[in-house]
Amino acid sequence: MPGSDFRNLMAQSESSGNYGILTDAGGGDMVAGAYQFGDARLEDFMKDTGEEFTREDFLASPELQDRVMNWHEQDVVDYAMENGLDRFFGQEIKGVPVDMSAVVGMAHLGGRKGMRDFLESGGELDKKDKFGTFISDYGRKFSGQSLYNETPPRPRMRPQGLLPPETSPRPMARPAGLLG
């Protein structure tokens, strides 16, 4: 499986690395592929990139699934940086050493809002999925994993230009004590 330590761990955790799996996430929602993306997240990807595909296309293409995962990681990192959530990096919240990979892991389970609520509440808002997995569980599991194995993230373009350097995504997850 190509990519980062984070991505390999995510695929193993979500699907045992099975790119062709379709799982009932409860409430009539299905999640698909090695990383178990739901329809809403796949629609976010298609809207952002202009690509279009069916769930069947997605399940049949490991390359497409890896592209979506690349986009997903970058999208969560951009969201965290644009919303000042990097101020939590280096802290431990409810047993989660907060770094970029923990943030992406928490957002993968609970969405960007669930991750943000967890951080801003000091861990008090720690939602769980239908299997009983808490956002904090994913934070602990994925903290310290390298996100970008092949290329560092690109700065996201905005109408006013590039984000200033102090808000640009950091290229690698870093040990909690090293973030300033």
Please identify what each model-predicted range represents.
Residues 1-28, 34, 40-180:
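Non-catalytic cell-wall polysaccharide-engagement segments
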